[in-house]
Amino acid sequence: MWALVGRALAPWAAGARHAAASEPRAACRLFSAAELKEKPDMSRFPVEDIRNFSIIAHVDHGKSTLADRLLELTGTIDKTKKNKQVLDKLQVERERGITVKAQTASLFYSFGGKQYLLNLIDTPGHVDFSYEVSRSLSACQGVLLVVDANEGIQAQTVANFFLAFEAQLSVIPVINKIDLKNADPERVGKQIEKVFDIPSEECIKISAKLGTNVDSVLQAVIERIPPPKVHRENPLKALVFDSTFDQYRGVIANIALFDGVVSKGDKIVSAHTKKAYEVNEVGILNPNEQPTHKLYAGQVGFLIAGMKDVTEAQIGDTLYLHNHPVEPLPGFKSAKPMVFAGVYPIDQSEYNNLKSAIEKLTLNDSSVTVHRDSSLALGAGWRLGFLGLLHMEVFNQRLEQEYNASVILTTPTVPYKAVLSSAKLIKEYKEKEITIINPAQFPEKSQVTEYLEPVVLGTVITPTEYTGKIMALCQARRAIQKNMTFIDENRVMLKYLFPLNEIVVDFYDSLKSLSSGYASFDYEDAGYQTAELVKMDILLNGNMVEELVTVVHREKAYTVGKSICERLKESLPRQLYEIAIQAAVGSKVIARETVKAYRKNVLAKCYGGDITRKMKLLKRQSEGKKKLRKIGNIEIPKDAFIKVLKTQPNK
């Protein structure tokens, strides 16, 4: 069965499997330094000598390390100890040791007396960036599925395999980290056979860190991955699968050529915007930009054509020659934001700088959605949509590191939906089903027939001894169990349907702490389901605070309300009168905390004497406090808002 499935070929890559002679492998630089300066001639590579492949894996299984070794082995970069995460160019990627943005590199490799062009696309491993992975796979005909010999198959390994499987790509399983003391490649090989139906003898066992057996990976790429099925004599047809923004040269589009040839000076048109551009530069990524005279069908490279805005280089767009229109390639589904958070400048005088920083960063990250927003307490800001929590943290970190912009980031919320009940409301909103990304705009129960909340299908892979604890955690998060599979005698795969708002803040942390860090988690969008949602208001002495309005499930209303009231009590400064902090659903108060008043000792001047004198002074004081409480406006300091609204770890 696997012979039919695992080697299934991409629709545009159904070329015959290339049988390479099993002669000794010889890695060499195809172009000398002088030739590279002179722009290499890419016509040297016929289509049958090109392989486009991607490396996919769970976070931390050694994708970027394997990419470094492949770059060294093909002479693309010099062999030094400094080669760590060569393709991870962002500071945030190097600090966190993760890949955020997919990167491309063209490798020149001699094997069996022939010279091959191998285009490698390194992809992120974290669930939030699976959109980046699916985009990268569209430019490939095969993948290296890397699995850690110690940890075995993890949740993201499964998710990434099915992305490649659905794209009908050849899959080469690679078991990495065989140098580790606890490595058990035989066990992992059996897991791969059981879960993915790939014979264990097809697995390549390597150590990317030490470079052990890595050359056999390159041999497998040539032998097992088919060349792209393209036509160079046809008019140009190129897919834009990624883009970055350079403030001096404009948009740099990463393209995969399906048909034809592109060279400097060509006039090209975008199928999406119908705008025409003149090509200023084309080239390959080696892994840095290396200009070439031309790019030919089957090759992957970059193109600069004077586009001023990344929205002009739409991901999934087709580029073609002016006066030679072609049938556009099927694009990608645009990434759907799963998490929304308010972003405000710490000081309103920084608004314009932050606006400019967000605009520049969203040029490079088209999956972030931006809506203008304002708050009485925090001033003008934005409501940004992200693919997940890590995506949000990385975006915030990049704002600070690359643009020196410090921001207030509010607790993330998820996009709810409401089905409106009356024709009048439907006419007002212009649709029956409205999406709510700001809790303050949540419609009343009387206006809707039902509320809907987003749900995701989550996969948890855990050692069997933690199964009970993890199942209890999932049930506490309102999850419904769908499936349970034993991968081997020590590990189990659980599938649950989760409400997205239950996992968005701290589920991952709780899962890791319950399983001593051994469990892994991945999720995919599963649409919407009806839910009993309520809008919870926070009142201070009876006055509603708009910024603290939240949407919660009815079951969780008390817990969340109590938590917000407690945090607000810690943050609010004491006044001369008592402050009642209440959480209310509709007219019903469900939680309350009290900030005690400062008390002046009005009896200090009384030395003994009649008790009625003391009672009179105390009565006058309490009347004054009542009056003050009625007319007193509670000023909530900005710091208090920040403490309450900011993401609360492990709360």
UniProtKB/Swiss-Prot annotation:
PROSITE patterns: G_TR_1, G_TR_2. Residues 48-229 form the tr-type G domain. CDD domains: EF4_II, EF4_III, LepA, lepA_C. One of its GO terms (molecular function) is ribosome binding. GO terms for cellular component: mitochondrial inner membrane; mitochondrial matrix; mitochondrion. Residues 1-31 form a transit peptide. Keywords: GTP-binding, Hydrolase, Membrane, Mitochondrion, Mitochondrion inner membrane, Nucleotide-binding, Protein biosynthesis, Transit peptide. Gene3D superfamilies: 3.30.70.240, Elongation factor 4, C-terminal domain (3.30.70.2570), Elongation Factor G (Translational Gtpase), domain 3 (3.30.70.870), P-loop containing nucleotide triphosphate hydrolases (3.40.50.300), Translation factors (2.40.30.10). It is a peripheral membrane protein. Its EC number is 3.6.5.-. NCBIfam families: lepA, small_GTP. Belongs to the TRAFAC class translation factor GTPase superfamily. Classic translation factor GTPase family. LepA subfamily. HAMAP family: LepA. Promotes mitochondrial protein synthesis. May act as a fidelity factor of the translation reaction, by catalyzing a one-codon backward translocation of tRNAs on improperly translocated ribosomes. Binds to mitochondrial ribosomes in a GTP-dependent manner. This is Translation factor Guf1, mitochondrial. It comes from Mus musculus.
